Amino acid sequence: MDTSLFSLFVPILVFVFIALFKKSKKPKHVKAPAPSGAWPIIGHLHLLSGKEQLLYRTLGKMADQYGPAMSLRLGSSETFVVSSFEVAKDCFTVNDKALASRPITAAAKHMGYDCAVFGFAPYSAFWREMRKIATLELLSNRRLQMLKHVRVSEISMVMQDLYSLWVKKGGSEPVMVDLKSWLEDMSLNMMVRMVAGKRYFGGGSLSPEDAEEARQCRKGVANFFHLVGIFTVSDAFPKLGWFDFQGHEKEMKQTGRELDVILERWIENHRQQRKVSGTKHNDSDFVDVMLSLAEQGKFSHLQHDAITSIKSTCLALILGGSETSPSTLTWAISLLLNNKDMLKKAQDEIDIHVGRDRNVEDSDIENLVYIQAIIKETLRLYPAGPLLGHREAIEDCTVAGYNVRRGTRMLVNVWKIQRDPRVYMEPNEFRPERFITGEAKEFDVRGQNFELMPFGSGRRSCPGSSLAMQVLHLGLARFLQSFDVKTVMDMPVDMTESPGLTIPKATPLEILISPRLKEGLYV
């Protein structure tokens, strides 16, 4: 009898044990902690509102209270906020593909050819193909070497124009310049030449038509960055997209049309030139490359038509290269002016390794370790994309033990991560030496060290990081070699930041410059 009871209960006990074991192995849908104060319908939106609010700083303060992974409800969408390098590593390694998409936003629709600009495009075959083409045909090391003359000549032209201004003003006393605007024109010139073979600013006069195009291009790029950083109701509440409460979408559509006119003109001019040259034309710039690919039918299988593919990819490159480099150089020079001993150290390094009888060249940069450290430290303190770009989960995944559902948006607070006191001593101080002999001497900026990733990491990292670093290194070295620089009455530089997609300096960088080299080196 006992044996019969035992044989009856054993299978039942085994079944119960297996069921309990399976239940314990099921993934727990643990949600990241959410800040208190969420309101019905709008969620946490009111905590992030404010015209002059710096979102990366606000989110950084929240992270101090709620931890390195937070969940915010912004209208009808969930947003997962990352604020530590450990959580970022989890996102950009094991979960990189799951988090590789972009959300559809009003800015991307109205100004980005219905999300075709690859920096804002959702994860798709189209995004992969456009990114690959841009990388191979403009941003690869081979192509950058071929286009080196464009970068070098534009940097040289700025030095020449600044010197000419000094001569024009009398050639004896330091002359005041708004350096920020000069650097912005230099970067826009550089990208427009690489993409479309045109030059807008400095070095001679333009036809009235080109002068107006230059003005519209500068205005369009500025408006794009302003509008893409603005909150629109439809981004938080897609069902209300039909009603433009704030008028921002109207502005976006207008900016999109203005930029489209310029891009259309570039393409048409290239088509006419190709007709004239017949089969003898060469792919001298990116528009030519894209037209050749279109003629070969390379875009026929993709989501967008050939012309949209060309326009959107050209726009992506112009936007990516024209804003970030001048912003970083502006911050670097501002930091040096507020730390004059470091400014002198940088100029002394150039004088020792290069001298004053020739201009700094690319080949000199490897010996200018302090210049390299200054750029790294500037990118650490003022990353051009402090929150990288919004990502969106294309499938359910687990990040740092928290469940992230499909459709959840993600923000990575690089600004906060790169000021982590566990990693950096005196994290809010400007100390380039930390990248030479200090705690960060092994860190690189290419996305392999998650403690320092100003260009992002993983599939969505910036494909133009090599070009950016070349411009930053040579641009800073040439400027510091060419000019002595100081502020008016030796006053500290105002380091106030302005809201936006990047970290714009709120005020102009008005400085006094005077030449350090002999006249022949500016010509």
From Swiss-Prot:
<dbReference type="Pfam" id="PF00067">
    <property type="entry name" value="p450"/>
</dbReference>
<keyword id="KW-1133">Transmembrane helix</keyword>
<dbReference type="GO" id="GO:0071456">
    <property type="term" value="P:cellular response to hypoxia"/>
</dbReference>
<feature type="transmembrane region" description="Helical">
    <location>
        <begin position="1"/>
        <end position="21"/>
    </location>
</feature>
<dbReference type="InterPro" id="IPR002401">
    <property type="entry name" value="Cyt_P450_E_grp-I"/>
</dbReference>
<protein>
    <recommendedName>
        <fullName>Xanthotoxin 5-hydroxylase CYP82C2</fullName>
        <ecNumber>1.14.14.-</ecNumber>
        <ecNumber>1.14.14.165</ecNumber>
    </recommendedName>
</protein>
<dbReference type="InterPro" id="IPR050651">
    <property type="entry name" value="Plant_Cytochrome_P450_Monoox"/>
</dbReference>
<keyword id="KW-0472">Membrane</keyword>
<comment type="similarity">
    <text>Belongs to the cytochrome P450 family.</text>
</comment>
<keyword id="KW-0408">Iron</keyword>
<dbReference type="GO" id="GO:0016020">
    <property type="term" value="C:membrane"/>
</dbReference>
<keyword id="KW-0503">Monooxygenase</keyword>
<dbReference type="GO" id="GO:0004497">
    <property type="term" value="F:monooxygenase activity"/>
</dbReference>
<dbReference type="GO" id="GO:0006952">
    <property type="term" value="P:defense response"/>
</dbReference>
<dbReference type="InterPro" id="IPR036396">
    <property type="entry name" value="Cyt_P450_sf"/>
</dbReference>
<dbReference type="GO" id="GO:0020037">
    <property type="term" value="F:heme binding"/>
</dbReference>
<keyword id="KW-0812">Transmembrane</keyword>
<feature type="binding site" description="axial binding residue">
    <location>
        <position position="462"/>
    </location>
    <ligand>
        <name>heme</name>
    </ligand>
</feature>
<dbReference type="GO" id="GO:0005506">
    <property type="term" value="F:iron ion binding"/>
</dbReference>
<dbReference type="InterPro" id="IPR017972">
    <property type="entry name" value="Cyt_P450_CS"/>
</dbReference>
<dbReference type="InterPro" id="IPR001128">
    <property type="entry name" value="Cyt_P450"/>
</dbReference>
<keyword id="KW-0479">Metal-binding</keyword>
<keyword id="KW-0349">Heme</keyword>
<keyword id="KW-0560">Oxidoreductase</keyword>
<comment type="function">
    <text>Involved in the biosynthetic pathway to 4-hydroxyindole-3-carbonyl nitrile (4-OH-ICN), a cyanogenic metabolite required for inducible pathogen defense. Converts indole-3-carbonyl nitrile (ICN) into 4-OH-ICN. Can hydroxylate xanthotoxin (8-methoxypsoralen) to form 5-hydroxyxanthotoxin (5-hydroxy-8-methoxypsoralen) in vivo and in vitro.</text>
</comment>
<dbReference type="GO" id="GO:0106149">
    <property type="term" value="F:indole-3-carbonyl nitrile 4-hydroxylase activity"/>
</dbReference>
